[in-house]
Design a protein with these regions (language model features):
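Short alpha-helix
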Residues: 227-243
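A short SAM/SAH-binding and catalytic strip from SAM-dependent methyltransferases
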Residues: 117-128
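Short conserved AdoMet
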Residues: 92, 128, 142
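Conserved N-terminal segment of class I S-adenosyl-L-methionine
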Residues: 1-53, 57-113, 117, 229, ...
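Conserved class I S-adenosyl-L-methionine
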Residues: 146-178
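Extended, charge-rich helix/loop segments that form flexible
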Residues: 172, 176-214
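Short, glycine-/aromatic-enriched active-site segment of Class I SAM-dependent methyltransferases
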Residues: 160-167, 208-228
Length: 265
């Protein structure tokens, strides 16, 4: 049992995120704009005509928008059965989209070097071995393709980080139903402030443009994981520099996160 718990933690709490994606499984129209901001130097339009793998696909939100943008084929991989069930439901109308159970740390060798683009949006920073996962994802990128990442930044989060970490320390240890109840209560209390406070950071300013349900899911999401890395620019340069034959472009986006595109030469 202890070994199973350690494995789940190493993989980034997939069962807890699975509960989230089964609960918040609807693909909201506003999520397209969120994704476009996370992609940074890579445009959503550039997915047209590409074969894509999304690592940590959750309920299939990102693959949905990739197909809508014109991707020729999309494979979403995740470790949690609940997440995969929600993703299958969301992608069922697309003949060129499918999902598969797989770990970012151990991707199928049969797909190595076969994708024009591999994306990992909001997942790498929750893994115990991000370097290993990066190498596995990079091995799946075809010559001339690229790897697209979105990760938490230490820059822009220094003031909020103690608050976030306090709630995360609580939420990651509570039973999932209790964490969900606490997240709902926090959202109710925070909603008036989100609407009223003139935040300087782009990310927090944009929260007021999202629906209440979306904000609730974001707060819940922040309380779930056992692992959450916040990386500096130097950290991102080190991580992306590990990839042989890669040319990284790193952008600071939304005032609190990193978007990176690493092109394979």
């Amino acid at each position: 049992m202890a070994a199973d718990a350690d494995q789940k933690t190493a993989q980034g709490s997939p069962d807890r995120f699975g509960y989230e994606w089964a609960t918040y499984s609807a693909i909201l129209p506003e999520s397209r704009g969120q994704l476009e901001r996370w992609l940074g130097p890579t445009t959503l339009a550039s997915f047209a005509g590409k074969s894509v793998m999304d690592v940590g696909c959750g309920m299939g939100r990102n693959p949905y928008w990739y197909v809508e943008a014109g991707a020729t084929s999309v494979l979403g991989v995740d470790m949690d059965d609940g997440s995969l069930a929600a993703a299958r439901k969301n992608l069922e109308t697309f003949a060129n989209a499918r999902v598969q159970k797989a770990s970012a740390h151990d991707l199928d060798p049969q797909v190595h070097g076969t994708f024009d683009r591999v994306t990992c949006i909001g997942v790498l920073h929750h893994l115990a071995e991000p370097e290993r996962a990066l190498e596995r994802m990079w091995s799946c990128v075809a010559p001339g393709g690229d790897l697209v990442l979105w990760c938490y930044a230490k820059e822009g989060n220094r003031l909020m980080l103690p608050v976030i970490q306090t709630f995360r320390a609580l939420g990651s240890r509570l039973p999932i139903n209790a964490t969900h109840a606490v997240a709902k209560a926090i959202t109710m209390m925070a909603w008036p402030a989100i609407q009223a406070i003139p935040f300087r950071t782009d990310y927090y300013r944009r929260l007021r443009t999202l629906s209440f349900k979306n904000v609730e899911s974001i707060i819940f999401d922040q309380m779930l994981p056992h692992i959450a890395h916040y990386w500096t620019r130097e950290d991102m340069e080190r991580l992306t520099g590990l990839l042989d034959g890669g040319r990284p472009r790193i952008e600071f986006v939304q005032g609190n996160s990193w978007a990176a595109t690493i092109s394979r030469t």
